[in-house]
């Protein structure tokens, strides 16, 4: 079975974001249509391997920031699909930028929302750039070889 690569967009700044991040990664490991090994996960590809969750002082380093930003853009351009882990009550502005950039590059954009948050209102712009919005529990079985458009069942704000 063919496999697709993804750009894994997800916040990791709060406990809820970290929980959703881990749940999504576990689901992707089980998904037979994803080539996770060759996909781009920003937290695993920060410049010179310096993770700002462990070394926040690098958030003030222009070389680190510029290189990490450009690597992330390359990750979006060179992977098949943009996947965004989205928490309606904790929107991450960086994810919003990544979603818009992916759309500009002609990428299929999939938002994944934790089941307990699915149906809550989401940002109009995040909704607008998304080709589909699914529950976290659907991620392990989502067929990335046959991406389709569908409407989000919740409202927008």
Curated annotation (Swiss-Prot):
Active site: 98
UniProt KW Transferase keyword: yes
GO biological process: nucleotide salvage
Pathway connected to this protein: Nucleotide metabolism; nucleotide salvage pathway
A Pfam family hit: Nuc_deoxyrib_tr
Listed transmembrane segments: none
Coiled coil: none
Enzymatic reactions: 2-deoxy-D-ribosyl-base(1) + base(2) = 2-deoxy-D-ribosyl-base(2) + base(1)
An example Gene Ontology molecular-function term: nucleoside deoxyribosyltransferase activity
Description of pH dependence: Optimum pH is 6.0.
EC id: 2.4.2.6
Keywords of the record: Nucleotide metabolism, Transferase
Subunit: Homohexamer.
Family statement: Belongs to the nucleoside deoxyribosyltransferase family.
Task of the protein: Catalyzes the cleavage of the glycosidic bond of 2'-deoxyribonucleosides and the transfer of the deoxyribosyl moiety to an acceptor purine or pyrimidine base.
Protein name according to UniProt: Nucleoside deoxyribosyltransferase
Annotated organism of origin: Lactobacillus leichmannii
